[in-house]
């Protein structure tokens, strides 16, 4: 989920001052995260209809919630389903717990099109030691259920697991990421990356140009060898790519942007106009890819609704594309 604190690491500070070029169309894979931290949200069946009516073909949920899973049954909407951070230790230590999790949450809802299982979201501290064994146990459970390879198992991380500038110098700053990236390479799973130019900007507005964060600057900001960076999103994604490529055995791991967004109220630069600009430009841009990884980037916007019960900074409650009554917070076009 979107974070309360600023996660702009030093490499993001340096991706500054700047400019940007025309944004192409042609997005193939745009999704939206579906959070439920609200007391006034519509029923899941209405939510799935809202996805379908807007042409949104990918969805992320943060725990195996039976209501959206049932509503998704029989649709073609692709799904990321999270394992809550609180469940990691048991899944890491007990293969039978992983088997039970798969049976209850994947096999029981097999008519929903689950693409990825995210083993934790932005896990920190000592819990990071549970990520790899939990992924291993879940993959084994999927294989035993006859689902090996059809559902990829990964984990969702934020930008502060990387460091380095320019993007070509990106490395992982957290020790648990080295074995994780090699495991992802061995299974063919992507790294799920939460990418927020918003947090980088609000943490360093004197050094990072708002236009660079919003995809609206007129020229190159960072020249990194032959790669020209015209927006902060590309620079942050390619820092992940470089960190994966640092190990020759993990250079082919795909990057899926599992969260990105901009709040419409409640914080610095959090306006409906900026949120509309960022999210519409993101939709239009990700079909192009980044300088290091041309081609469509599967990307999930955070979030579907403004959620009045989210904790933390006021802006956390204003990342939604839609109000709880299903009216748009601002116009957005997914086509």
UniProtKB/Swiss-Prot annotation:
Annotated keywords: Glycosidase, Hydrolase, Plant defense, Secreted, Signal
PROSITE patterns documented for this protein: GLYCOSYL_HYDROL_F17 (PS00587)
Induction field: By pathogen infection.
Reactions accelerated catalytically: Hydrolysis of (1->3)-beta-D-glucosidic linkages in (1->3)-beta-D-glucans
One BP annotation, GO: carbohydrate metabolic process
Signal peptide region: 1-29
One term of GO molecular function: glucan endo-1,3-beta-D-glucosidase activity
Tagged with keyword Secreted: yes
Localization per record: Secreted, Extracellular space
Pfam families named among the record's database cross-references: Glyco_hydro_17
GO cellular component: extracellular region
EC numbers for this chain: 3.2.1.39
Active site, per annotation: 122 (proton donor), 259 (nucleophile)
Tissue distribution of the protein: Accumulates in aleurone layers. Much lower levels are found in the embryo, and none in starchy endosperm.
Main localization, broad class: secreted
PANTHER family tied to this protein: GLUCAN ENDO-1,3-BETA-GLUCOSIDASE BG1-RELATED-RELATED
Family as reported in the entry's similarity comment: Belongs to the glycosyl hydrolase 17 family.
Function: Is thought to be an important plant defense-related product against fungal pathogens.
Stated name of the protein: Glucan endo-1,3-beta-glucosidase, acidic isoform
Native species: Zea mays (Maize)
